[in-house]
C-alpha cells in the first residue's frame, strides 16, 4: 500500500522521509485493532537500469505498507447486504471497542480534544467550509436548523463534555470507524485508522462510535446501529454515551457530506448525480439527529413504592447531568409527609387531593425546566392514567421527547423493603 507524494493541508506526504514515517505509523496504529493484517513496511528499490523491486539492490525510491488482504465477503458492509450479521458478532465488535478505549492511550494533550471549546472549533470549521454550498447543494432551512441546534446543544451541555474529559473518555482512537473498515475474519478486524493527523484520531470515544452508528443507519440498518451502541454502552459501562451520541452522529454525517461536497464541482455529470443523492441523504440524517438532540427530554420514572424508582431516577440524573424532581420531596417540602412514620399508599399524604396537588407541582417544575430548553426527570408513581396523560400533554405542548421508564420487582422484595422502611421510621 503506497502513499502518494501529496500535500492537502491536513496531511503532508511530499518527502520520502515523511512517507516512510507515516507508513510506520499506519502499521503500529492499525495493529491495535487487527491481528496479523499489517505485516510491516517494505522498501521499493530502483536499479540503475530502471528496474523496480521489493528486494535486492538499488536505491530506495519508495516505501509501502505490507498487508495481508482480507476477503471482501468478510467485510461488515458485505455481511449486512447478505443478511449475515447476527447479535453475537455485533456484541463481539462492541466489546472489542470497549476494551480498546479502556486500554487506549490518554494524556493531557489528548484530553484537550474533548474540551467543549475544541469540539466547538471542529464543528464550526465544518460549518464554515460548507457555507458556500448552502442554497445550492445544501437545503438552506435544514442546514440553518442543524447549525443552530448544534451550537445550542453544545452550549447547554458544556458540563457533560467537561465531565467526559474528567472521567477519561477522551482517547487516541481510530478516527475513521465505518463499515468499510470493519471485517470479521474470524473475529473483528478493524483497519485503516487515521495515521496522518493526530487531531483526527484524538477525541471522545463517542466520536468514533458515532461514525459507525451513523454509517450503519446510512446503509439502511438502524436496528444494528442501535444494537451496537446499546451493546457498547453496557460493555463500557457508559450510559452517558446516549447524551452525546446523536450530536456526534450529526457531526460525522456533516463530515461525510463535506467530503462529497468538495468532490462535486470536479465530478462528471453522472457522478455528480450520485454525489448529490449522497449529500441529500447525509444532510437528512444530520437534520434528523439534530431534531432528536435539539429537543429536551421529559423522563417519567414511574412504578410502585419500593420498586427502586427513586434510586434509578437519582442514578439517571447523575449520569445524564439533568435535574430530577421527586414527588416524595415535594410532599415533605409541603409538610404533608405525616408524622415520620410510614404512611400507607393511598392514605395520608398519598390521599387523592394531596396527590393531585403534588402532581400539579411536579408537572409545573417539569414545564419550567423543559421550557428553558433542559431535560428533566419526574420521579413519582404515576399510577393513574390521568397523571400519565398530563405528562404526555406536557411533552406534546412543548414538543419534547418523552420517555416512560417503569421500575418493577417481585412482590416479596417490595414487602421486604416496605417492612424495612417501617422499621427505620
Named regions from a protein language model:
Residues 1-174, 179-255:
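Conserved ATP-binding subdomain of kinase catalytic cores across diverse folds
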Residues 169, 293-299, 372-374:
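Pre-Walker A (Motif I) flank of P-loop NTPase domains
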Residues 258-301:
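ATP/Mg2+ or Mg2+-diphosphate-binding catalytic cores
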Residues 312, 316:
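Hydrophobic positions on the alpha1 helix immediately C-terminal to the Walker A/P-loop
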Residues 317-374, 416:
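Conserved substrate/cofactor phosphate-moiety recognition/catalytic segment
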Residues 336, 343-353, 396-425:
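A glycine- and Lys/Arg-enriched "phosphate-lid" helix/loop adjacent to the NTP-binding pocket
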Amino acid at each position: 500500500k503506497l502513499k502518494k507524494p501529496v500535500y492537502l493541508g491536513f496531511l503532508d506526504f511530499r518527502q520520502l522521509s515523511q512517507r516512510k514515517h507515516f507508513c510506520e505509523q499506519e502499521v503500529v496504529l492499525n495493529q491495535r485493532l487487527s491481528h496479523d493484517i499489517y505485516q510491516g513496511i517494505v522498501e521499493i528499490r530502483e536499479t540503475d537500469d530502471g528496474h523496480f523491486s521489493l528486494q535486492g539492490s538499488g536505491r530506495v525510491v519508495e516505501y509501502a505498507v505490507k498487508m495481508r488482504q482480507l476477503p471482501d465477503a468478510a467485510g461488515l458492509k458485505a455481511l449486512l447486504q447478505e443478511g449475515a450479521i447476527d447479535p453475537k458478532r455485533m456484541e463481539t465488535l462492541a466489546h472489542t471497542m470497549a476494551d480498546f478505549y479502556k486500554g487506549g492511550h490518554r494524556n493531557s494533550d489528548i484530553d484537550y480534544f474533548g474540551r467543549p471549546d475544541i469540539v466547538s472549533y471542529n464543528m464550526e470549521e465544518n460549518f464554515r467550509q460548507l457555507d458556500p454550498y448552502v442554497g445550492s447543494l445544501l437545503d438552506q432551512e435544514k442546514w440553518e436548523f442543524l447549525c443552530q441546534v448544534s451550537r445550542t446543544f453544545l452550549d447547554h451541555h458544556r458540563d457533560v463534555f467537561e465531565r467526559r474529559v474528567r472521567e477519561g473518555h477522551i482517547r487516541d482512537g481510530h478516527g475513521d470507524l465505518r463499515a468499510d473498515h470493519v471485517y470479521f475474519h474470524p473475529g473483528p478486524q478493524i483497519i485503516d485508522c487515521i495515521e496522518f493527523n493526530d487531531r483526527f484520531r484524538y477525541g471522545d470515544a463517542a466520536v468514533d462510535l458515532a461514525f459507525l452508528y451513523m454509517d450503519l443507519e446510512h446503509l439502511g440498518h438502524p436496528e444494528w446501529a442501535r444494537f451496537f451502541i446499546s451493546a457498547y454502552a453496557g460493555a463500557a459501562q457508559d450510559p452517558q454515551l446516549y447524551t452525546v451520541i446523536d450530536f456526534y452522529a450529526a457531526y460525522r454525517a456533516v463530515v461525510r457530506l463535506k467530503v462529497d461536497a468538495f468532490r462535486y464541482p470536479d465530478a462528471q455529470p453522472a457522478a455528480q448525480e450520485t454525489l448529490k443523492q449522497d449529500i441529500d441523504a447525509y444532510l437528512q440524517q444530520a437534520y434528523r439527529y439534530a431534531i432528536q438532540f435539539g429537543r429536551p427530554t421529559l423522563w417519567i420514572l414511574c412504578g410502585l413504592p419500593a420498586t427502586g424508582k427513586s434510586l434509578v431516577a437519582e442514578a439517571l440524573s447523575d449520569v445524564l447531568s439533568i435535574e430530577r424532581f421527586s414527588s416524595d420531596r415535594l410532599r415533605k417540602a409541603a409538610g404533608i409527609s405525616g408524622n415520620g412514620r410510614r404512611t400507607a399508599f393511598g392514605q395520608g399524604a398519598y390521599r387523592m387531593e394531596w396527590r393531585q396537588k403534588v402532581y400539579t407541582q411536579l408537572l409545573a417544575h417539569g414545564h419550567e425546566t423543559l421550557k428553558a430548553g433542559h431535560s428533566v426527570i419526574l420521579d413519582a408513581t404515576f399510577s393513574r392514567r390521568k397523571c400519565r396523560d398530563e405528562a404526555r400533554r406536557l411533552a406534546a405542548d412543548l414538543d419534547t421527547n418523552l420517555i416512560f421508564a417503569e421500575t418493577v420487582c417481585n412482590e416479596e422484595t417490595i414487602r421486604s423493603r416496605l417492612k424495612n422502611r417501617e422499621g427505620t421510621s
